[in-house]
């Protein structure tokens, strides 16, 4: 995104309805060829193909991961979801059938709670868990649905300059730009620039409102 001068795209949630409606999704892995996902980037939540990508059907969803930084000098600009930092591989906590797990885990022995002489054994039903994630997928982003009227501030726009009233829409890489808004069809997502100013770290940013 050209508005980003340092680090990665950021999001300041001024008024995002997903925080009230619960339209937050984090069950599908990013497609294997996606190396980086930045907050404020838009993706398709492609449930048919069991992946997050840029080409699926349906509405654009906004990437809005929890910012995790681990050094004192790091700020929001230093965070993005980078594939090499993640190693998820299964859709569930187990990822395989319990009959398979019996070969490596012994549930037959009694366990004892602290301070108790009465033992108990695990009653594990023979349930099959979902299959492993697709080859090459390792990260599962958190995405949110936006609605008309939503407002947020970001530098995740693929433009060098903007002014109030400019309309934006996601391009093929999920970043907002004017060209995509100009070619958008009826019913497609659109955002309008309501204010041009800066983020807390003094990088250029825009406040946006969804209008379609």
Placement of each model-derived feature along the sequence:
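Surface-exposed, low-hydrophobicity beta-strand/loop segments enriched in small/polar/acidic residues
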Residues: 1-212
């Amino acid at each position: 995104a050209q508005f980003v001068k340092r680090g990665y795209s950021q999001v300041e949630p001024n008024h995002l309805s997903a925080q009230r409606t619960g339209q937050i999704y984090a069950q599908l892995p990013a497609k294997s060829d996606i190396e980086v996902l930045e907050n404020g980037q838009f993706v398709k939540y492609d449930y048919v193909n069991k992946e997050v990508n840029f080409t699926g059907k349906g509405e654009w969803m906004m990437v809005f991961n929890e910012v995790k930084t681990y050094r004192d000098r790091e700020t929001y600009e230093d965070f993005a979801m980078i594939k090499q930092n993640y190693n998820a591989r299964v859709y569930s906590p187990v990822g395989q059938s319990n009959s398979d797990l019996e070969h490596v885990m012994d549930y037959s022995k009694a366990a004892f709670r602290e301070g108790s002489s009465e033992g108990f054994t695990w009653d594990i039903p023979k349930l099959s868990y979902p299959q492993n994630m697709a080859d090459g997928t390792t990260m599962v982003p958190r995405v949110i649905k936006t609605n008309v009227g939503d407002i947020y501030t970001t530098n995740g726009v693929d433009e060098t300059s903007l002014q109030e009233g400019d309309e934006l829409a996601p391009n093929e890489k999920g970043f907002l730009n004017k060209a995509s808004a100009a070619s958008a069809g009826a019913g497609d997502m659109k955002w309008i620039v309501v204010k041009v100013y800066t983020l807390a770290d003094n990088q250029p940013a825009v406040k946006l409102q969804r209008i379609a």
